[in-house]
Regions:
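Short, small-residue-biased leader/transition segments that mark boundaries at the very start
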Residues: 1-3
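C-terminal cap/loop subdomain of S1 sulfatases and analogous C-terminal strand-loop tails that border
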Residues: 7-16, 20-99, 103, 138
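Active-site oxyanion-binding pockets that recognize sulfate/phosphate
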Residues: 10-13, 110, 114
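Non-transmembrane alpha-helical segments in soluble domains
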Residues: 24-28, 47, 51, 111-114, ...
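Basic/polar N-terminal segments that are highly enriched at the extreme N-terminus
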Residues: 51, 143-146
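Bilobed periplasmic-binding protein-like "clamshell/Venus-flytrap" ligand-binding domains
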Residues: 56-59, 130-144
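Residue-level structural signal for beta-strand termini and adjacent loop
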Residues: 84-85, 113-115
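Intrinsically disordered, low-complexity polar regions and short flexible loop motifs
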Residues: 106
């Protein structure tokens, strides 16, 4: 994400997680617009990141393909649970042994460090369980157009 407003945003680079879901919350706060409190808002307010280059409040990100959880990002780690090439026509592959990468040291995701990081895997497993417990399945507006 690249944002520029020298009157409001401190110039610099933050190498943390930020998603498009954070834009609604952040821009609402910047415009002094109240965030709805009658529903769960997935995005985080990134104003402190923009103003002081502090760490992002977003530590986790869930990669979905439709309703399928494909991968999970936790801090600098990314765990792939399933693989699916978007246009090759092959079925989705559920990995017997997931792929774990440290994106700080391996941004190209070439070296699977799954076997050497059981503590990270335990933490990501906790994150997945909490996420699935908190998840509210919404109607798929692209499929359920009836």
């Amino acid at each position: 994400m690249c944002i520029r407003d020298r009157s409001y945003i401190k110039p610099g680079i933050v190498d943390d997680i930020g998603t498009s879901m954070d834009l609604f919350t952040t821009f609402s706060h910047m415009a002094d617009v109240a965030i709805p409190n009658d529903r769960i808002i997935d995005g985080n307010n990134l104003i402190s990141v923009f103003k002081s280059l502090s760490k992002s409040p977003t530590e986790n990100f869930f990669y979905y393909w439709g309703a399928e959880l494909m991968a999970v990002r936790y801090k600098s780690y990314k765990l792939h649970l399933k693989l699916h090439e978007a246009y090759d026509g092959k079925p989705m592959e559920v990995l017997k042994t997931p792929f774990l990468y440290n994106l700080d040291t391996d941004p190209s995701e070439k070296n699977n460090i799954y076997e050497d990081n059981l503590d990270v895997l335990d933490k990501i497993d906790e994150i997945i369980k909490k996420h699935k417990n908190d998840l509210i399945i919404a109607k798929d507006l692209l499929i359920d157009l009836k």
